[in-house]
A protein has these predicted regions:
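Active-site loop immediately N-terminal to the catalytic Tyr-X3-Lys motif
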Residues: 100, 147-153, 175-176, 217, ...
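Alpha-helical segment proximal to the catalytic Tyr-Lys
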Residues: 127, 171-175, 238
C-alpha cells in the first residue's frame, strides 16, 4: 500500500517542475491528484500521464493570485474526490533584480504568486481539512527564504515570508490536526532556474555549473524535492509541524 492511499492532494504549479514531479510521486503513492495551474495544456498533460499509470487525477485552471480561483480549486477537490487531505502550495516565480532596479509591478507580482497564493489556498483548504479530521499543508519556500541572495529582493522577501507564515499557520491550526510545514529547496534543475541565467545575462551552462557548487556537487532534481514533499505529506512526519526542511545538497551548510 502506498503512503498516500485514499488521500486527496491539491498541488499548485503542478504543470511543470517540482509540482509536476510531486504530482507523479504522490499519485504513485496512492493519492488522488488535483492539478491546479494557470497553464491548462501542461496541467492537463500531467493528469493524462497519471491516468495512463492507472492513477486518479483532475485538472482545474487556477490563477493562484485570485481568491475565486483558489476557492474553486478546493471545491473541485471536494466535489471530485470527496475531500482534501494534502495541499502543496508550490506555485512560484522569481525576478532577479535589486530593490533599485525592481519595478513596483514586478514586486507585487512576485509577492502575489509566492505569498498571497498560500494565504488564499490555505484560507479555503483549512476549513475542509478541519471538518475532515485534519490534513497537511506544504509550502514551497527557498534556501533564500533562510538567507539572503543577490539581486533577488522580492523573491527573498517573499520566501522569507513563507517561512514565518508557515510557522504561524502551524500554531493556529495544530489543535485542528492540520500540520503545516515548508520546504526550502536549493537550486533545482527547472525551467525557472534556467530562466535565471537569462535574467542575469549569463551563459546557461556556466550558470548551472556555478549552481552546482555545493558539498554534494550538483543541483537538485525535481524528484529530490518531491521526495521531501512526500515525507511531509505522509504519516511519516506525523509529529512534524511548523518546520522548514532545507533540501539543498548542503548549500547552506
Amino acid at each position: 500500500m502506498g503512503q498516500l492511499e485514499e488521500k486527496t492532494a491539491l498541488i499548485t504549479g503542478a504543470a511543470s517542475g517540482i509540482g509536476r514531479a510531486a504530482a507523479l510521486l504522490f499519485a504513485q503513492e496512492g493519492a488522488s491528484i488535483v492539478s491546479a495551474d494557470i497553464d491548462a495544456e501542461r496541467g492537463k498533460d500531467i493528469v493524462n500521464e497519471i491516468e495512463r499509470l492507472n492513477g486518479k487525477a483532475h485538472f482545474v485552471p487556477c490563477d493562484v493570485t485570485r481568491a475565486d480561483h483558489c476557492q474553486n480549486a478546493v471545491e473541485h477537490a471536494v466535489q471530485r474526490f470527496g475531500g482534501l487531505d494534502i495541499l502543496f502550495n508550490n506555485a512560484g516565480i522569481i525576478v532577479r533584480q535589486s530593490v533599485v532596479e525592481l519595478g513596483e509591478t514586478d514586486w507585487d507580482r512576485v509577492m502575489d504568486v509566492n505569498v498571497k497564493s498560500i494565504f488564499l489556498m490555505s484560507k479555503y483548504a483549512i476549513p475542509v481539512m478541519r471538518s475532515g479530521g485534519g490534513g497537511t499543508i506544504i509550502n514551497t519556500s527557498s534556501g533564500w527564504g533562510v538567507v539572503g541572495g543577490p539581486q533577488a529582493a522580492a523573491y527573498c522577501a517573499s520566501k522569507g515570508a513563507v517561512v514565518l507564515l508557515t510557522r504561524s499557520m502551524a500554531i493556529d491550526f495544530g489543535p485542528d490536526r492540520v500540520r503545516v510545514n515548508c520546504i526550502c529547496p536549493g537550486d533545482t534543475d527547472t525551467s525557472m532556474l534556467r530562466d535565471e541565467a537569462r535574467q542575469m545575462r549569463r551563459e546557461e551552462d556556466e550558470f548551472m555549473a556555478d549552481a552546482a557548487n555545493r558539498p554534494l556537487g550538483r543541483v537538485g532534481t525535481t524528484e529530490d524535492i518531491a521526495k521531501a514533499a512526500l515525507f511531509l505529506a505522509s504519516d511519516q512526519s506525523s509529529f512534524v509541524t511548523g518546520t522548514s526542511l532545507i533540501v539543498d545538497g548542503g548549500g547552506l551548510a
